[in-house]
């Protein structure tokens, strides 16, 4: 039998990750091989956000950045998001160490991860925090989610993955025991056991009323009654006679997306309303949609001491061949003489079933969600590519929807009101 300490955690309520509504509880098991004096037994819950950035000017080597022969300038940043301890021994009011006999001892504890980042109150004007941006200031009111918390850099084989792993948000529970070794204390190397926990706050799971606004936009993230917003293609398509055509997406709910949201159904408020707008009468032409590609782009930024690195990646959500010819004689004529026609994609056998992130995709070790904290910012945008055949000429149009706030869980059910009361309320006489 050897003296050791073991940390045991009760699983989160959902079995996957803790939220600010969960009580993080567990026990510390202290096994003593012989009678021992215990100076202190404690449990610490700590959250940190760490980044390292590399100067672009020094990245001109064929070697991987982690190669010791690669020369670069690096900056580091560490923010303490949360730090709370629970003392288990000695009991409250007892200052001296406690002598315990050879045995196994078990002590319970509990925490709650709530509130905003602890470090925010100490930010200086020169701290270069992403939270200083008004578009992200609401994130400072709540703790950020775990991110890259299971990576230690081992096994990284590409430059792309190396840079992606230079930022992390990690929450740990650590049990420590200061015990006597012979006639001496060993405070610099106490017995300890540490566990990494996964934390995902409610603001990253699904929209919370009045809690968030779209990054870089004044639009409310979820507003089912909002007027449609128009997202136009980056460039017009000019036909042989000088007539121009512009694809547009009109949506009141594309500033955000939940997991399992339908993307092309008209009722979803996403890509269900795609229009072609012509500058004049196009009836002499033929326009056919031949292919549709939808991608989600991720932008992850790390900052440290005023230097910022950005990591870009792309996830293809859908690539579907089509053969839909636009009926140019049925276009709606607008007041300015332009004409528009809607693409009827909601009944397509593939597009009508397409739901966002149905497979609960893990991207580089993380589920898909947006967040911003002091030194890390994770953002997304949609790219819709429409491939046409205009008068037998192949044409490609690109529509960008930026930014898009991505939520990790499905949308909460719509409010349905209270059920009707089946009986008449009683009458009381004075």
Curated annotation (Swiss-Prot):
**One GO cellular component from the entry?**
plasma membrane
Q: Where is the composition biased (Polar residues)?
A: 63-72
Which processes are annotated in GO (biological process)?
A: ubiquitin-dependent endocytosis
User: What are the record keywords, sorted?
Assistant: Cytoplasm, Endocytosis
Q: Where in the cell is it found?
A: Cytoplasm
The molecular function terms of the Gene Ontology recorded here are:
protein-macromolecule adaptor activity; ubiquitin protein ligase binding
Q: List the disulfide bonds.
A: none
For region Disordered, the annotated ranges are: 55-75
Q: Which Gene3D superfamilies match?
A: 2.60.40.640
What functional role does this protein have?
A: May regulate endocytosis by recruiting RSP5 ubiquitin ligase activity to specific plasma membrane proteins in response to extracellular stimuli.
Indicate the family of this protein.
Belongs to the ART10 family.
From the Swiss-Prot or TrEMBL record, give the protein name.
Arrestin-related trafficking adapter 10
Q: Which organism is it from?
A: Eremothecium gossypii (strain ATCC 10895 / CBS 109.51 / FGSC 9923 / NRRL Y-1056) (Yeast)
């Amino acid at each position: 039998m050897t003296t050791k300490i073991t940390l045991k955690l009760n699983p989160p309520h959902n079995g996957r990750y803790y939220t600010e509504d969960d009580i993080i509880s567990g026990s510390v098991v202290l096994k003593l091989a012989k009678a021992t004096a215990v100076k202190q037994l404690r449990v610490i819950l700590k959250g940190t956000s760490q980044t390292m950035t590399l100067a672009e000017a020094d990245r001109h080597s064929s070697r991987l950045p982690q190669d010791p022969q690669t020369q670069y300038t690096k900056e580091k940043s560490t923010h303490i998001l949360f730090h709370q301890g629970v003392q288990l021994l000695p009991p409250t009011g007892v200052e001296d160490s406690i002598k315990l006999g050879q045995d196994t001892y078990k002590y319970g504890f509990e925490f709650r991860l709530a509130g905003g980042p602890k470090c925010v109150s100490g930010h200086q004007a020169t701290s270069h925090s992403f939270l200083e941006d008004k578009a992200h200031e609401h994130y400072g009111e709540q703790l950020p989610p775990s991110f890259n918390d299971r990576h230690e850099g081992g096994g990284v084989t590409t430059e792309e993955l190396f840079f992606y792993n230079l930022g992390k948000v990690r929450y740990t529970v650590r049990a420590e025991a200061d015990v006597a070794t012979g006639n001496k204390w060993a405070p610099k190397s106490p017995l300890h056991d540490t566990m990494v926990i996964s934390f995902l706050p409610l603001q990253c799971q699904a929209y919370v009323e009045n809690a968030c606004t779209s990054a870089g936009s004044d639009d409310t993230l979820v507003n089912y009654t909002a007027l449609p917003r128009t997202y136009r293609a980056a460039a017009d398509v000019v036909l042989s006679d000088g007539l121009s055509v512009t694809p547009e997406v009109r949506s009141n709910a594309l500033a955000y997306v939940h997991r399992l949201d339908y993307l092309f159904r008209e009722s979803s408020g996403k890509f269900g309303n795609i229009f072609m707008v012509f500058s004049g009468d196009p009836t002499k032409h033929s326009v056919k949609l031949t292919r549709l590609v939808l991608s989600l782009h991720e932008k992850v930024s790390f900052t440290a001491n005023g230097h910022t690195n950005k990591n870009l990646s792309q996830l293809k959500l859908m690539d579907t061949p089509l053969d839909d010819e636009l009926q140019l004689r049925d276009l709606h004529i607008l007041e300015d003489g332009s004409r528009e026609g809607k693409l009827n994609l909601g009944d397509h056998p593939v597009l009508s079933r397409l739901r966002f992130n149905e497979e609960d995709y893990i991207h580089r070790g993380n589920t898909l969600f947006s967040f911003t904290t002091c030194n890390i910012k994770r953002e997304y945008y949609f790219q819709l590519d429409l491939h046409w055949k205009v008068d037998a000429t192949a044409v490609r149009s690109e529509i960008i929807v930026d930014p898009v706030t991505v939520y990790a869980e499905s949308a909460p059910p719509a409010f349905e009101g209270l059920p009707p009361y089946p009986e008449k309320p009683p009458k009381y006489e004075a």
